Amino acid sequence: MGSSSGQPEFDYLFKVLLIGDSGVGKSSLLLSFTSNTFDDLSPTIGVDFKVKYLTIGEKKLKLAIWDTAGQERFRTLTSSYYRGAQGIIMVYDVTRRDTFTNLSDIWAKEIDLYSTNQDCIKMLVGNKVDKESERAVSKKEGIDFAREYGCLFLECSAKTRVNVEQCFEELVLKILETPSLTAEGSSGGKKNIFKQNPAQTTSTSSSYCCSS
């Protein structure tokens, strides 16, 4: 049932951030989740943004998902997008070991530095498991990292869509279990999380799906 503006109604609005090195597949992961398609995409310039509607249990959710550039020259641009995020997904490429080591050297430190939400739910995602023969990071290493840094963990393939929906759904379920985050995201008290400079986003799109 839609609202008077033609947009689907929702109970919660959550901001989710995708971070990680350039080329690990953040944009492809987001595209696979929001539109059920896959493309080998060029690196994001600055920040991209998409909206996804879904239903989990009886809760209608609106996810504002921010896809950040991994290149160092965009770090000062993307740092402001950590503010107010209820969920952060750290993505690495299981076939490129440097993208895994940079999680602790760069990305976990950025979360500590820029995240304004101490209860923010973090998830570690190892992408490109469809290239198993080229694997350079074991699943156990991912599990150990997630345990050390207090993250959820999944491996996935944006290309084959294995575990793509699970990545976002498990993150959202954990957010829903965290009272301080649901209070922030309730439709009655939602923040202006869309009001970062729109000139810095490269595209805006939306999709709608329901899952149980």
UniProtKB/Swiss-Prot annotation:
Give any Pfam family that matches. Ras
**N-acetylglycine: modified positions:** G2
- Which residues bear S-geranylgeranyl cysteine-type lipidation? C209, C210
Q: Which UniProt keywords apply?
A: Acetylation, Cell membrane, GTP-binding, Lipoprotein, Membrane, Nucleotide-binding, Prenylation, Protein transport, Transport
> Main localization of the protein?
membrane
Topological category with respect to the lipid bilayer? Lipid-anchor
Molecular function (GO) terms listed?
GTP binding; GTPase activity
The subcellular location is: Cell membrane
Q: Where is this motif: Effector region?
A: 41-49
Would you tell me the protein name for this molecule?
A: Ras-related protein RABC1
What lineage is on file? Eukaryota, Viridiplantae, Streptophyta, Embryophyta, Tracheophyta
